[in-house]
């Protein structure tokens, strides 16, 4: 059997068996996995979204008031940060790449290790605000800080009649994040019937993506992700062990996840730290393929800096321990695939940070 036939056979098996191999795969009526256009995004409460936008850019939501959500999810960088490994909380430093927040509302799972349900945006925001290695915020302190900003109190009361509640702030920020959706991506126009939306080279790439390459077996649905965890053998980022701060943050993550024998771990074990199932060693959630033009570097640890490198990596069958099979793509086929991947990016989301209101502490006895 040729490499081409092997890949096509694996793709057919993945599509037919479904839950047994790639649970959550989006399939067409004929059973084959497919890409889909983004669904319409239901508009949220405009007043809640506006407050959420302010809070997204406000450093008062972090423990030392040194970072905001936008520090690691910068609109100018595709709501990512452009670095291989996220800086995380000041002086702590993180051990994974900061993914884009664009299209988060459509995700099946959050986090590279797939530990959070994609339907629960509020929990994602809560974890990012309160985790010691991201924003290190106490909800009670956050509640009091925001309550000392009259403009925020007024904005809050446009959609709620009670006082600002720290636990409810997570949902408010989440409502803003839900508004971050790709705009006018060529792939969406193409999938809706506009044959002119893709160039001839991109169409060739689409055929490779859905055919010879077998990419669609895992990269399907509106995001180009099955929402499952897989081992593609991405090499370790040596910076994690070279930098003691990042090493400590990794081990702290293992400890709080209840991973056995975590002090002996010196690699990022992915979903295993969550499931404790040895079969999940080195497995990470399939990333979205949306907005790749703006969100380099790639993979869970930023080890691949260009889309050409990504395609080369998959063409060779991934890295050590990978579940993948070499694709056998020619140079022109690889270029076509890269061109197609770029078509999954829409127009830049040009978001301007709002002017943030100042504190105006209330006086005791006069509230």
Curated annotation (Swiss-Prot):
Heme c 2 binds at residues 215, 218-219. Heme c 1 binds at residues 69, 72-73. The keyword Repeat applies. One of its GO terms (cellular component) is periplasmic space. This is Cytochrome-c peroxidase IdrP2. It comes from Denitromonas iodatirespirans. The iodate reductase (Idr) complex is composed of a molybdopterin-dependent iodate reductase (IdrA and IdrB subunits) and two associated peroxidases (IdrP1 and IdrP2). Its main location: periplasm. It is an enzyme of class 1 (oxidoreductase). The gene is idrP2. Involved in iodate respiration. May play a critical role in detoxification of inadvertent H(2)O(2) generated by the iodate reductase IdrA/IdrB. InterPro entries: Cyt_c-like_dom (IPR009056), Cyt_c-like_dom_sf (IPR036909), Cytochrome_c_Peroxidase/MauG (IPR051395), Di-haem_cyt_c_peroxidsae (IPR004852), MauG/Cytc_peroxidase (IPR026259). One of its GO terms (molecular function) is electron transfer activity. It catalyses: 2 Fe(II)-[cytochrome c] + H2O2 + 2 H(+) = 2 Fe(III)-[cytochrome c] + 2 H2O. Residues 1-28 form the signal peptide.
């Amino acid at each position: 059997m040729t490499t081409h036939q092997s890949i096509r056979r694996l793709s057919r098996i993945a599509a037919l068996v479904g839950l047994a191999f790639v649970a959550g795969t989006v399939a067409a009526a004929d059973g084959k996995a497919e890409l889909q256009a983004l669904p319409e995004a239901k508009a949220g409460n405009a007043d809640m979204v506006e407050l959420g936008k302010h809070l997204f850019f406000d450093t008062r939501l972090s423990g030392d008031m040194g970072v905001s959500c936008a520090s690691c999810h910068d609109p100018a960088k595709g709501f990512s940060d452009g670095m291989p490994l996220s800086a995380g909380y000041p002086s702590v430093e993180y051990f994974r790449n900061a993914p884009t927040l664009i299209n988060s509302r459509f995700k099946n799972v959050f986090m590279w290790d797939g530990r959070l349900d994609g339907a629960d945006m509020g929990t994602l925001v809560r974890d990012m605000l309160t985790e010691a290695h991201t924003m290190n915020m106490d909800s009670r302190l956050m509640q009091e800080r925001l309550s000392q900003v009259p403009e925020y109190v007024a904005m809050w009361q446009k959609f709620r009649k009670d006082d600002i509640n720290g636990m409810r702030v997570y949902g408010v920020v989440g409502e803003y994040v839900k508004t971050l959706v790709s705009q006018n991506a060529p792939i969406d126009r193409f999938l809706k019937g506009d044959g002119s939306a893709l160039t001839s080279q991109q169409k060739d790439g689409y055929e490779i993506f859905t055919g010879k390459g077998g990419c669609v077996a895992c990269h399907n649905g509106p995001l180009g992700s099955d929402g499952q965890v897989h081992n593609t053998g991405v090499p370790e980022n040596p910076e994690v062990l070279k930098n003691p701060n990042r090493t400590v943050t990794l081990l702290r993550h293992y400890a709080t996840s209840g991973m056995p024998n975590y002090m002996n771990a010196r690699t990022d074990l992915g979903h295993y730290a969550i499931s404790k199932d040895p079969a999940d060693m080195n497995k990470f959630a399939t990333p979205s393929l949306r907005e790749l033009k703006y969100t380099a570097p790639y993979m869970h640890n930023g080890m691949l800096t260009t889309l050409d490198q990504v395609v080369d990596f998959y063409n060779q069958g991934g890295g050590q321990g990978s579940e993948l099979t070499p694709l056998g793509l020619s140079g022109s086929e690889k270029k076509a695939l890269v061109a197609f991947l770029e078509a999954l990016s829409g127009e830049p989301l040009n978001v301007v940070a709002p002017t943030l209101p100042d504190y105006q502490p209330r006086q005791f006895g006069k509230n």
